[in-house]
């Protein structure tokens, strides 16, 4: 009898933001396949599982996606409960949809367990509400990294009127800035750069679109980091919003 694959979001980093369903999946797992951006302390929930490191991070040597999928398939066909543990939410730039579809084509049952995405949790940890009545009525989540390195429609995003949350953008700051300015976004549009969201070494830098490159250089911004762009970053909230229950 085949096992099952759980595509689990580990959240942004803070282990207290892990969902109860994710904890149960980890506790019941025979095999846990762990991404690079998962906080190691989260693995305390699966002390008896076999751990397999399948790191994927931009700019670094990564485990091939085909290898990851075939490894999930092999363990599931051997009747094991497999957790594919991903940072953030598996459905936000985490390829969960692709993996679930691939597993289904090969006759393997899977289930997605959502996690809190870094764009939301990082903004909240810095006192930034992504929507705010009268200021921002929508949010656009976008990755600056594409499979074929094709440019994004930054000009259209500049005209969306929503808060922009940019993932995987550290290496493309010049492209982001130029595209948004070309789309008519004002140079004084405020933004926040948030590195290592919700972790003990989280760092934050407030800037604006016109000074993005200068301030990112002075700040020595490094991955993993997100950009939050829009009026909601203008210190609406005077202190970080509590992430605890």
Curated annotation (Swiss-Prot):
CDD domains: SUMT. SUPFAM superfamilies: Tetrapyrrole methylase. Keywords: Cobalamin biosynthesis, Methyltransferase, Porphyrin biosynthesis, S-adenosyl-L-methionine, Transferase. Pfam families: TP_methylase (PF00590). Pathway: Cofactor biosynthesis; adenosylcobalamin biosynthesis; precorrin-2 from uroporphyrinogen III: step 1/1; Porphyrin-containing compound metabolism; siroheme biosynthesis; precorrin-2 from uroporphyrinogen III: step 1/1. Belongs to the precorrin methyltransferase family. It is a step in the biosynthesis of both cobalamin (vitamin B12) and siroheme. This is Uroporphyrinogen-III C-methyltransferase.
